[in-house]
Amino acid sequence: MGAIPLEHGLAVAGILFCLGLVGLMVRRNILFVLMSLEVMMNASALAFVVAGARWVQPDGQVMFILVISLAAAEASIGLAILLQLYRRFHTLDIDAASEMRG
């Protein structure tokens, strides 16, 4: 069983990134926006791992760990903002977030 070719891995990462970007631009629900951001971050992490595996360097795996930790921080902060938005305005519409400015 061989390794995944670089072109295929980067193509999958690019497709996932584009799907996340479309979800980010199209959806108005903040939960789906957060999910789209997670897909985009995981796509970039996949690109790092594939490139690192191609050149037999551990840098791709190090960047993967960094991206995953950033994604966890982004998810926790995003979910905290989501909860406050829902408690205050009883909606998850991202346009209501502009009203959160004190």
Curated annotation (Swiss-Prot):
Residue spans crossing the bilayer? 6-26, 30-50, 62-82
The record's Gene Ontology cellular component field reads:
NADH dehydrogenase complex; plasma membrane
E.C. number, please? 7.1.1.-
User: What is the protein name for this chain?
Assistant: NADH-quinone oxidoreductase subunit K
UniProt function note: NDH-1 shuttles electrons from NADH, via FMN and iron-sulfur (Fe-S) centers, to quinones in the respiratory chain. The immediate electron acceptor for the enzyme in this species is believed to be ubiquinone. Couples the redox reaction to proton translocation (for every two electrons transferred, four hydrogen ions are translocated across the cytoplasmic membrane), and thus conserves the redox energy in a proton gradient.
Asked if Secreted is a keyword of the record, the answer is no
The record's family statement is: Belongs to the complex I subunit 4L family.
Write out the GO biological process terms: ATP synthesis coupled electron transport
In Gene Ontology terms, what is one molecular function of this protein?
A: quinone binding
Q: Where in the cell is it found?
A: Cell inner membrane
* Entry-linked Pfam families: Oxidored_q2 (PF00420)
Membrane association type: Multi-pass membrane protein
Q: Which domain of life is it from?
A: Bacteria
- Respond yes or no to whether keyword Cell membrane is given for this record: yes
